Amino acid sequence: MFFVLSIMNSIINTKNMKLSALIFIFGFSISLYSQDKPAYKIFTGEGKKSDYEVLIRVISKADIVFFGELHDNPIAHWLELEITKSLFAAKGKNLILAAEMFETDNQILIDEYFSNLIKEASFESEARLWNNYGTDYKPLLNFAKDNGLKLVASNIPRRYASVVSSGGFEELEKVSSDGLKFIAPLPVDYDPDLKCNKDMLSMSGGPMGHASPNLPKAQAIKDATMANSILKYWQKGQTLIHFNGSYHSDLHQGILWYLNKKNPELKTITISTILQDDINSLNDESKGMADFVILVPSSMTRTYKSAGQ
């Protein structure tokens, strides 16, 4: 009898050991794969590894935060919302949202929608929203609305940017006094030697190609207007987070160039979204691009395809 019990215990122990080994191997495999395929990593502008908690701690002390997104990147859009939630937990009603994706002449529509004067359908039909609004920007707008936060429509109406693209800054002199309310005060400073302006001209086919020298000026009037909108609504003690394409804030140029001309004392923090094949370290050419870099695998899916992609 004792011999039989010993055999049974041995069998049970062997099965338990095998089960434990299988559980360990399974758990290790899950851990290994999850570590091998991160969706993003955070670095400082100098290329040092950072993390989400450090990012939130730093930006919650800033006056103005610029989140430079890639418009078709799902990780950027997800983090925009998550960072907004974390900032709200830290700042409460001292948080303001602002975005390139909404134009200044639509501020009244946002305000009327937030106050429930107009319905969602009316707002969405009139506001000239981006094609990816529903998936990428509506969650931010809804968060602001649901929590009683201000959302600033910061960008110039596209019709005026088109005017500059076609005929230069001089064409804005034809805009009515009512229209000028939606644009940065004229005349607008412009430095053609800024890297962002030179790069814009180069990417568009100039200066040796056929690109119009007015294309960087159209970008500049957007940046100047967004800076003007930020200064119009930000108040001391608040943190304003501005969502824009990374091109508008990379290298602390673009919007920040105009912002610093008006108020150099502002504490600003920039975030840039960058794609790399290997996200374990920041490439040298991306160092200095922003105060924080969100590194995303180049293979990450896109939320939509724009023209030319």
Each model region followed by its residue ranges:
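Bacterial N-terminal signal peptides that target proteins for export
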Residues: 11-21
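Sec-dependent N-terminal signal peptides
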Residues: 20-28
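Compositional signal for N-terminal targeting/processing segments
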Residues: 33-309
